[in-house]
């Protein structure tokens, strides 16, 4: 991997308009890598540029530069774009643009333009009159609106209450919001604490039933939504017919959002307000709307502290796979690079591929002579499958991988993972990555199918301990599909603890679980039953402190009976208990 020093020597750094204007004074050809501050220049192309610089040996007429679109007015159309863009400037005029890290095309273009410059200098040809191309990103060319419309975006907060979550109204409410022309900018699923409810609803604290309201709002999951009116908001219609599953205005839950610029003008006209629309749809009792600037800021600080910082980010999941030979010989080297490149490994597992699975992952090679050998190799032993998460993760992983064959990688992308981890056993890339977000979703679901299990926080847990446990659960990658506080009946306890009903301590267990409400949860992720049991730790807190000191029982357990949490023993038991405690348990 090239050092920063070498990169600067090879490419002039342009990070403001003044340096851009200065670059346009260059004589001859300047190849400009236009990049975003959050992802940096396209490192995969730097070996090609170094090769061209050395082989052409034309320092007077061949220059390379990297330009940060964020801080250069001229490059405004390329801001917040994921794909690399390369501009070709000849004597200060931008005459060509190539999108994507297309090494062969860039290589050919540079060689042809330098050949022209040599002939012009030798008097063998007149300078061609190339038209200067407009600096408009292809994604913007079909848009009728300016990408920099100065429209003050307005934000409000929608709080979908626990009873709406339990009754599975969340999806309906979100669809209504987006159907009305509003945009759901961010979403956070949480169990509100008493302190948060008292703080956020201080305006009604003097009402006689406020204590009961606080108890209700802390009894289960709430959804906190950041909603913007958008630059084009059509007044909501009265129609209430159901909408399709497509929600174009709603962002993915994996994508973090941004802190709002709260202004006194945040209150919308009443006829355009989200509050009035939800009232007309008979949903206002299930969803509170907050538009007061100060209160919106409170919610932002509490639930979306990185909202502004993450505004331009695009978190994506992708499937990565190390083929058997690479997994066996250099797994640790690959994992180190993955972490160094700021990927988060959400899940990983060893898997021996079936012939059908191998053929699906190697479809791009099916017409090659070595296809059968490749399938044989792919099914010969365990591969390592990973779910990776990163800003622009899918494209960034594909860029790191490089070409599909070792031959092309070594010639054009010697620093790609394909070239770095080439092996004699196969002429193809030893690593795999999904080719689209749709494919990634399908492949992740195949190799890491979701599973749900029962989680229970016992009555003796304090509110602070419950809050800490929920935080640990989320950080472990579990989705809180459903949560509710409930007083368990003896019949329900018997279902939750089917293996201990005849034990001597069962009476003590019944008594302990009857002293107050338990927090009952449906926890969802891949391999959820085993992962939740691992996170809980051994039944005895003293044993847990020795064997699993970071486990929940080691941190919060008091005794075998009061060991703070419980979980199902197996998938069958989990399904039985969840069905008994939650009617028609499914995610909102």
From Swiss-Prot:
A Pfam family assignment: Thioredoxin
Region (NDK 1): 157-257
Residue ranges, annotated region (NDK 2): 315-455
Keyword match Iron-sulfur: no
Chief location category: cytoplasm
GO MF, one annotated term: 3'-5' exonuclease activity
Domain Thioredoxin residues, every copy: 2-119
GO biological process: cell differentiation; cellular response to reactive oxygen species; cilium assembly; flagellated sperm motility; spermatogenesis
E.C. code: 3.1.-.-
Alphabetically ordered keywords of this record: Ciliopathy, Cytoplasm, Developmental protein, Differentiation, Disulfide bond, Hydrolase, Primary ciliary dyskinesia, Repeat, Spermatogenesis
Disulfide bonds: 39-42
NDK 3: region residues: 456-588
One GO cellular component term: nuclear speck
Matching InterPro entries: NDK-like_dom (IPR034907), NDK-like_dom_sf (IPR036850), Thioredoxin-like_sf (IPR036249), Thioredoxin_CS (IPR017937), Thioredoxin_domain (IPR013766), TXND_domain-containing (IPR051766)
Residue ranges of the region described as Disordered: 230-261
Protein's cellular compartments: Cytoplasm
Cited PANTHER family: NME/NM23 FAMILY MEMBER 8, THIOREDOXIN DOMAIN-CONTAINING PROTEIN 3
Role played: Probably required during the final stages of sperm tail maturation in the testis and/or epididymis, where extensive disulfide bonding of fibrous sheath (FS) proteins occurs. In vitro, it has neither nucleoside diphosphate kinase (NDPK) activity nor reducing activity on disulfide bonds. Exhibits a 3'-5' exonuclease activity with a preference for single-stranded DNA, suggesting roles in DNA proofreading and repair.
Complexes and interactors: Monomer.
Disorder named in the UniProt entry: Ciliary dyskinesia, primary, 6: A disorder characterized by abnormalities of motile cilia. Respiratory infections leading to chronic inflammation and bronchiectasis are recurrent, due to defects in the respiratory cilia; reduced fertility is often observed in male patients due to abnormalities of sperm tails. Half of the patients exhibit randomization of left-right body asymmetry and situs inversus, due to dysfunction of monocilia at the embryonic node. Primary ciliary dyskinesia associated with situs inversus is referred to as Kartagener syndrome.
Entry remark concerning the domains of this protein: Contains 3 inactive NDK domains that do not possess all residues considered to be crucial for the NDPK activity.
Family from the record: In the C-terminal section; belongs to the NDK family.
UniProt name for this protein: Thioredoxin domain-containing protein 3
Species the sequence originates in: Homo sapiens
């Amino acid at each position: 991997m090239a050092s920063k020093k070498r990169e600067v020597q090879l490419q002039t750094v342009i990070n403001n308009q003044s340096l851009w204007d200065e670059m346009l004074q260059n004589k001859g050809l300047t190849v400009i890598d236009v990049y975003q501050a959050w992802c940096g220049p396209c490192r995969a192309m730097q070996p090609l540029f170094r090769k061209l610089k050395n082989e052409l040996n034309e320092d007077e007429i061949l220059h390379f530069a990297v330009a940060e679109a964020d801080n250069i007015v001229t490059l405004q159309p390329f801001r917040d774009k994921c794909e690399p863009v390369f501009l070709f400037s000849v004597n200060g005029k931008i005459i060509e643009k190539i999108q994507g890290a297309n090494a062969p095309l860039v290589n050919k273009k540079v060689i042809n333009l330098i050949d022209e410059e040599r002939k012009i200098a030798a008097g063998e040809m007149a300078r061609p009159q190339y038209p200067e191309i407009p600096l408009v990103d292809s994604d913007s060319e079909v848009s009728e609106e300016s990408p920099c419309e100065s429209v003050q975006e307005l934000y409000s907060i929608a709080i979908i209450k626990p009873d709406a979550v339990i009754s599975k109204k969340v999806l309906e409410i979100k669809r209504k919001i987006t159907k009305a022309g509003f945009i759901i900018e961010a979403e956070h699923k949480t169990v509100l604490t008493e302190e948060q409810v008292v703080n956020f609803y201080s305006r009604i604290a003097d009402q006689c039933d406020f204590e009961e309201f606080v108890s209700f709002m802390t009894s289960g999951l709430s959804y906190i939504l950041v909603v913007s009116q958008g630059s084009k908001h059509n007044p909501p219609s009265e129609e209430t017919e159901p909408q399709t599953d497509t929600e174009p205005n709603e962002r993915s839950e994996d994508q973090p959002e941004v802190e709002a610029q709260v202004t006194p003008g945040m209150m919308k006209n009443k006829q355009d307000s989200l509050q009035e629309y939800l009232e007309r749809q008979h949903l206002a009792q299930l969803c509170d709307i907050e538009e007061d600037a100060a209160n919106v800021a409170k919610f932002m600080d509490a639930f979306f502290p990185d909202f502004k910082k993450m505004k331009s980010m695009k978190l994506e999941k992708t499937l990565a796979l190390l083929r058997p030979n690479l997994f066996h010989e250099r797994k640790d080297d690959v994992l180190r690079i993955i972490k160094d490149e700021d990927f988060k490994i959400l899940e990983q597992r060893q898997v021996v591929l079936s012939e059908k699975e191998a053929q699906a992952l190697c479809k791009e090679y099916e017409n090659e002579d070595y296809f059968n050998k490749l399938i044989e190799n792919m099914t010969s032993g365990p591969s390592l499958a990973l779910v990776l998460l990163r800003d622009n993760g899918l494209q960034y992983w594909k860029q790191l991988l490089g070409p599909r064959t070792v031959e092309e990688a070594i010639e054009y992308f010697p620093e790609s993972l394909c070239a770095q981890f080439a092996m004699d056993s196969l002429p193809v890339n030893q690593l795999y990555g999904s080719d689209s977000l749709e494919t990634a979703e399908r492949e992740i679901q195949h190799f890491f199918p979701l599973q749900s299990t029962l989680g229970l926080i016992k009555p003796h847990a304090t509110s602070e301990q419950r809050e800490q446990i929920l935080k640990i659960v989320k950080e472990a990658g579990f989705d809180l599909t459903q949560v509710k506080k409930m007083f368990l009946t003896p019949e329900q306890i018997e279902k939750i603890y089917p293996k201990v009903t005849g034990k001597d301590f069962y009476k003590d267990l019944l008594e302990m679980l009857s002293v107050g409400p338990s927090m009952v949860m449906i926890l969802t992720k891949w391999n959820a039953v085993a992962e939740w049991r691992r996170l809980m730790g051994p039944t005895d807190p003293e044993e847990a402190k020795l064997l699993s000191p970071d486990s929940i029982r080691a941190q919060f357990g008091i005794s075998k009976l009061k060991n703070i949490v419980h979980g199902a023993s197996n998938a069958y038991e989990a399904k039985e208990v969840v069905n008994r405690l939650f009617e028609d348990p499914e995610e909102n």
